[in-house]
Swiss-Prot record:
It comes from the Eukaryota. Residues 1-108, 203-233, 365-385 are annotated as: Disordered. GO terms for molecular function: E-box binding; RNA polymerase II cis-regulatory region sequence-specific DNA binding. The gene is CIART. Residues 33-45 have a biased composition (Basic and acidic residues). This is Circadian-associated transcriptional repressor. GO terms for biological process: circadian regulation of gene expression; locomotor rhythm; negative regulation of DNA-templated transcription. Residues 70-79 have a biased composition (Polar residues). Its main location: nucleus. It is found in: Nucleus; Nucleus, PML body. Transcriptional repressor which forms a negative regulatory component of the circadian clock and acts independently of the circadian transcriptional repressors: CRY1, CRY2 and BHLHE41. In a histone deacetylase-dependent manner represses the transcriptional activator activity of the CLOCK-BMAL1 heterodimer. Abrogates the interaction of BMAL1 with the transcriptional coactivator CREBBP and can repress the histone acetyl-transferase activity of the CLOCK-BMAL1 heterodimer, reducing histone acetylation of its target genes.
Length: 385
């Protein structure tokens, strides 16, 4: 029979010979089979030494522990190598991507072509179409066009309008979308012709506006003095007064026709050959009421009058303030009728420089009174009404 030492050596040898077939060792690149046999031949020495010392440890677990330690020691340094080799590759890829992005950004910022400038200019010109487009978009969102458009058409219209507004708000998009922007420009001018007309008029006639600007100020300044008079109360403007033996002066008298109307139903004598006219208390009785009607034509220039007066009830005609100029619009002939009452000692003269003197015969009452009282001719001065 075999001795225990031979059995132990045989068992240790068999265990050592079984390790080279392990796939784990071959995966991690362990040493060759010859080296493992040499290690197995020298392996029983520690067992025999332990056996001589009286201890019988199992050689298998020792071998397994040793192999496991070696495998762990050999496996752990392999991971740092792989990690170290992978990390530089990842870092280089990130650096390359960042460098590429920087280069593209620099190229886009530095290289601006004429097309890019034209695109930006067109976007700025079409900025005026953004408010009506947004109003149209809001109307679509609120359902203002539900009767005329289907839901699909409304969604498509909203999408198109949003894209157009987005393009107009980004003038830095560049030459790439210039053709599309030109098509959008034609479409917007078709949709909103009034805005296109306003832009063309504003762009082409700025210097004309600056030239016409002072003229508008002068027109407004010329029309401003007349506006307070129109706003004033008629009662304040309608008081006209006459004082006996106080002449009325006329600076520049326009072309007009004069008609004297008596309160009693008598015939009004027409204008006759040049001469002079005078009224005294002879032909007209005391307290006789007369009316003066002035027909003013185009080209009327402002005239003034000055005389202390007594108030007379306002009339339907436009009144005049004594001592202040009055401007009449040249829209057409105007009629001014001012009824007055003549006292017994009142005299009325008519002698304007530009108005020819007229000779007239007044008929008052019955023809018998006209025969008994012949008309008297004298120089006269006309009221400036």
């Amino acid at each position: 029979m075999d001795s225990p030492s031979s059995v132990s050596s045989y068992s240790s040898y068999s265990l050592s010979s079984s390790f080279p077939t392990s796939p784990v060792n071959s995966d991690f690149g362990f040493p060759s089979d010859s080296e493992r046999e040499d290690k197995g031949a020298h392996g029983p020495r520690p067992d025999t030494v332990g056996q001589r010392g009286g201890s019988r440890p199992s050689p298998g677990p020792i071998r397994c522990r040793h192999r496991s330690k070696v495998s762990g020691n050999q496996h752990t340094p392999s991971h740092p190598k792989q990690r170290g080799s992978a990390s530089p590759m990842a870092g280089s890829g990130a650096k390359r991507s960042r460098d590429g992005e920087l280069e593209t950004s620099l190229n886009t910022q530095g290289c601006t072509t004429e097309g890019d400038l034209l695109f930006a200019q067109k976007c700025k010109e079409l900025q005026g179409f953004i408010p009506p487009l947004t109003d149209l978009l809001n109307g679509l969102k609120m359902g203002r066009f539900e009767r005329g458009l289907s839901s699909f058409q409304q969604s498509v219209a909203m999408d198109r309008i949003q894209r157009i507004v987005g393009v107009l708000q980004k003038p830095q998009m560049g030459e790439r979308y210039l053709g599309t922007l030109l098509q959008v420009e034609g479409m917007l001018k078709t949709w909103f012709p009034q805005i296109a007309a306003q832009k063309s008029s504003l762009g082409g006639g700025k210097h004309q506006l600056t030239k016409h600007f002072p003229s508008h100020h002068s027109d407004s300044a010329a029309s401003s003095p007349a506006s307070p008079m129109e706003k004033m109360d008629q009662t304040q403007l309608g008081h006209l007064a006459l004082k006996p033996k106080q002449p009325w002066h006329l600076t520049q008298w326009p072309a007009m026709n004069l008609t004297w109307i008596h309160t009693t139903p008598i015939c009004n004598p027409p204008l006759s050959s040049p001469g002079t006219i005078s009224f005294s208390h002879g032909p007209l009785g005391t307290g006789t009421g007369i009316g003066v009607i002035l027909f003013l034509q185009h080209g009327v220039q402002p005239f003034t009058h000055s005389a202390p007066t007594t108030p007379v009830p306002p009339t339907t005609a436009s009144p005049v303030i004594p001592g202040e100029p009055m401007k009449l619009s040249g829209e057409g002939p105007r009629c001014y009728s001012l009824p007055v009452t003549l006292p017994s000692d009142w005299s009325y003269t008519l002698s304007p420089p530009s108005l020819p003197t007229l000779a007239r015969k007044m008929t008052i009452g019955h023809r018998e009174q006209q025969r008994s009282h012949p008309p008297v001719a004298a120089d006269a001065h006309l009221l400036n009404l």
